[in-house]
Structures are given as structure tokens and as C-alpha cells.
């Protein structure tokens, strides 16, 4: 099945939800706050890829174990299938000038494969897209921003700098961003992107034909080619899905009752090969281990839309919070997430909010590094 309309995917987590055992605090935004020293927010990747710590949380036994990520194979259930997100981060942030000379930043939010170029009257390519504009003065419809090789015309404006725009350029758009663009590092990384980020803020299995995410699926950053090969030699399966990570992944939940939060949507794909691998694992009783919240969102979003895992292309805006019953993911590999974030709420739905926050407290006390370039967690 190929779904092309956002209504074909589940909007929220009501499908499969059972709130009878959910505490009131699970729905309160205040229930997702925790203290984190500033120095434990990782500003750089570890010196060597994969040299991360691993916090293993066993939901059944209640025992938490501290380990190294390179040893993750010794904790994974026998015969498990790992499902990873193979999308690649686009250097989607452009720096330029307004006609008046003022500085402006543009971040392309529309996944690159969904940009549909046409030929304009001036012979250049043009396409409408969604973006984020930051400028010293308010931008208005009709304004045109100039970047190196790219003109951006504002069509409509929305909250928090989001805009509908028409882009004008010559040649290959992907090549233009790859040459001139900057990686949109998360806002809590307080430095400009550097040369090292262009390799380290990508997973080793990301694909050039899946270029278009504005953030990395960070649980995958810990994997090296050697570790991936070793896991497959140990009998673990490997499948890949695609979710173009949107900037909404950094947006905090603002609603005091999280059930009223409007979740951002993201574009995803499950190939026939991946669907077959996942269904085979389920049929054979082999656990499915999702590599990150993005892979988890793909599988649970597809299940919410179709009632099964099958080839799928389309949008998901599923919001997973406590009370949700997981249908596909049996275990999750993930990083440590921001307070009050939808990602922390998803992990709390999987492992329990109080137990998750207790684990986070232990990780803080043990000096774990947090967020995108930080350490990892395996939830069994």
C-alpha cells in the first residue's frame, strides 16, 4: 500500500490506547521535568564513533546496568531484528541577506524528495516548500531573501518563523545545499557546525538517496560498520526504514495537558523488503528492536494507519504518550531526551514515566552525556 495523504496515518495515540492504568501525572507536562547539569549536555561527539556508554534498563527485572555501547550485543535478545532509520541529514540551513542588507537564515523543512521543481519564466528552477526564516526584522509575504545560488520568496508566514516559500535556483538543488548549506545542529549545541559534524552527525548506514532530514536519528550515531557487521555475525537481523526527521523533533510540548498537544508530522517509508523482515521476525517470535524513536515512530505509525506492517509511503503525526500500547517495537535503543519533549513521552509510554525518570536520575548521577551527541540507552 502506498499512502500519500496525511489522513491515512494515525494522528494521535488513541489507537491501541488504554488509559485505565495511567496516572494523572502521566498527562501533566510538569511530570516530564528533570534536573540536568549544563555540562552533561554533549556539545561534541565522542572522540571515536561508538565510544559511548550504554545504560541498560530491564523493564521485567527492574535491574539497570551500566555498560559500553560496543558490548550491546551481549544484552540483546537472541535472534533479535534491529530496525534502523537510514535517512540522511541535509545541510539545510542557508545564511544570506535581505535586499536591505540585513542578515537572514533559512532552514528548508520540506523533505528534499518531496520538493517538486518546475521551470520558471526566468529559466531557473522553482518550487514551493515549507521553511523556517530567522531575520533581524519581521518577514512578510512578498519578501525575497537572497542566498548564494538560491532566492527564497515568502508566500505565507506562520508561528515561530515557519513560512511557505517559493525557492528559485539553477542546477541541482541537493548539490546546492550540499555545497552552501550548514548542518542544522540542535539548538542546545551552542556552537557553529564544523567539518567534523558533516560525518559525525550522520549514521554510517545513512543513504544518499534518503537525503532530507533536518536532524539525525541519533541513536544510530553509536553504530560503526564493524559493530553492525559483528551483530549480524552474532545472528541478529538488520532492517532499514526511512523517516525524514523534521525540525518539530526539537519543539517542546507546550500544553500543560499533554493530550492536547498538536504533534508535528513527518514523512516516512517502509519498503517491501523491510516489511517482510519485520513480519518474518514477528511470525517467528523474534524480538523487534527499534534503533531510535524515529524508527519506533515509523513502525507504530504504520501500524496505526494499516493495522499491520506492510510497504508504506506517507505521513505520520502519531503522538505516543503513556497509555499507548506498542504493537511492533519490543525493545528500543535510544539516546537521553530533553525534558518536556515528545520523545521523552514516547519513552515513558514504553518504560513507564516514573521508571524512566528514575533511570534518568541514575544516569545524571553517573555522569552520562545527554541528547544528540550523548550516550545511549537500551530498554529491554
From Swiss-Prot:
Residues 1-24 are annotated as: Disordered. Monomer. It catalyses: 7-aminomethyl-7-carbaguanosine(34) in tRNA + S-adenosyl-L-methionine = epoxyqueuosine(34) in tRNA + adenine + L-methionine + 2 H(+). Its EC number is 2.4.99.17. InterPro entries: QueA, QueA_dom1, QueA_dom2, QueA_sf. The lineage of its organism: Bacteria, Pseudomonadati, Thermodesulfobacteriota, Desulfovibrionia, Desulfovibrionales. Belongs to the QueA family. Transfers and isomerizes the ribose moiety from AdoMet to the 7-aminomethyl group of 7-deazaguanine (preQ1-tRNA) to give epoxyqueuosine (oQ-tRNA). This is S-adenosylmethionine:tRNA ribosyltransferase-isomerase. The gene is queA. Pfam families: Queuosine_synth. Residues 1-15 have a biased composition (Basic and acidic residues). One of its GO terms (cellular component) is cytoplasm. It comes from the Bacteria. GO terms for molecular function: S-adenosylmethionine:tRNA ribosyltransferase-isomerase activity. GO terms for biological process: queuosine biosynthetic process; tRNA wobble guanine modification. Pathway: tRNA modification; tRNA-queuosine biosynthesis. It is found in: Cytoplasm. Keywords: Cytoplasm, Queuosine biosynthesis, S-adenosyl-L-methionine, Transferase.
